[in-house]
Amino acid sequence: MPKVEIYKSILLEKIGKNLTNYELESIIETAKAEICEIDIVNDKIKIEFNDTNRPDLWSSAGLARHIKTYLSGNVPSFDFFSMTDNLQKFYGEIFVSPEVFGIRPFIFGFLAKGMICDERMLESLIQLQEKLSHNYGQKRKRIAMGMYSSNLIHFPINYVTCSSDYKFVPLGMDIEMSIKEINERHPKGIEYSSIFENVDQYSLLLDYKNNVLSYPPIINSRDIGTLKVGDTNLFIEVTGTDLEATLLSLSIVACDLYDMGFKILPVKTVFPRETLFGKEIICPYYFQNSLKINVDSVNKLLGSNFTANDMCLDLKKLGISAYFEESDTFYIMPPVYRNDFLHEVDVIEEVMIGKGLDNFKSELPKDFTIGKLSPIEEFSRSVRNLMIGMGFQEMIYNYLGSKVDFIEKMNIKGSELLSVSNPMTESYEYIRGSIIPDLLKSESISSNFPYPHKIFEIGKVALKDLVSDEGTVTYDNLAFLMADKEFSFNEINSLVSSLFYYLNIGFKVKESSKNLYIDGRGADILVNDIVLGCFGEVSPYILNNFGIMVPCCVLEININGLLN
């Protein structure tokens, strides 16, 4: 969970009230956080957040805003945000090239002027940058933030691609380095360059005079990308692969700088094609949708008897604009710096926090039940223990993936796979129908580790099913991969026999026609004359698609069928 370190004096100054340590500890609980340590000597407080959905709280400005709003009940306003029907004047432009749109598509920015950066302010900004990029940004893969002195930048800015031979002087270095050299030798390149695996073009941020701002999300340039104490005019940009996450991150930083005393000047981003919010977006941009909440639903879940007016007042203590037109419903508008309202229940939780947990009496459950594992979970655990006992290491993968990994590299038509409508990124456009592509992808990036490699996963897969009412069917599958130059069909056949022996299940095999396997070295697994899975040596063609140079054997089997 995210941990931040902030100056206590700055926090209290922004709150506008001298709270005792006890009062501070109590009110910080409303942010789903707790104080780990109070360092009186260095004037610092260490806070751990128990929720990753509130990145707006990971700074002294954001936390102070939350506490101040909770105490006053006044919803903060930010008049520099654009909306669909109310676009702000912009003071700079960013042009996105079609080439970079397919690599790391989204970038937004704004200008901040009017304050002098002191040491503590700069430290707070750098910490926010790191927390947003690392925690919320999934180690810069989802989003990453860059900060610059705008005095050195000539607008408009161009967000383009470059080859691995392109050179500039990166931050922390005194000599020019190519993109390839940065990826291999610069500390940030070594840490984050895996974001750009299997690409031959890289993202680059240039100003109008072709000065390099940064190689996002890896490293800024030394000449323009150095922010220091005494700077007054800032340019902030956020790049990412998720449109809403990128917009939200920029909004959070804009609100923080505004609360620090900066004047926020919007910047327009122009994309090569339409996005969910248009081809041109002036940022900071308010994109969140309102929610309609039923009063009875709130009271039923909380065991309360609150009116719509009561609920609206409680929500305003958390910075949420709320109003009602009828006594049985009300509407909320999420704050510009939040996007964690996915369901009515999320709003009900906020009502409870706004009312105060101490105002709800605890009750013992009226019904007594005993929980237990489902049969499929018990069986899965048995299979998992057997795999670990046979020397395999368990993996856990996402259920979503790309067309490239699930279809093209596997050399299948993919007609049975389920696709996601309007995916935000090509990396998550299909629901997996097999675990094997994930195992092969892991093997493709593991060539530097000693062989043999033996990995497995027990997880869900989904396929189209025209017979069922939903049109889909979900299975629990076991899949494993063995990689070594000595492995062959005999080794995996022996392992399959051992697995079924310990499960006390009889099985038969017949030659498989799947193009996943080398001809004559793949087999279907039949239990009670029903095909439940397959195993064999992976075809060199498919191994080459994944960039794997070592022979691999794989198995995948439906464990629902084994249990039945």
Curated annotation (Swiss-Prot):
Which parts of the sequence bind Mg(2+)? 340, 346, 349-350
Primary localization class, coarse: cytoplasm
Q: What class of enzyme is it?
A: ligase
Question: Coiled coil located at which positions?
Answer: none
Q: Which CDD domains match?
A: PheRS_beta_core
Q: Which GO cellular component terms are attached? A: phenylalanine-tRNA ligase complex
On assembly, the entry states: Tetramer of two alpha and two beta subunits.
UniProt-listed NCBIfam families: pheT_arch
Query: Under what name is this protein listed?
Result: Phenylalanine--tRNA ligase beta subunit
Q: Which organism is it from?
A: Borrelia recurrentis (strain A1)
Encoding gene per record: pheT
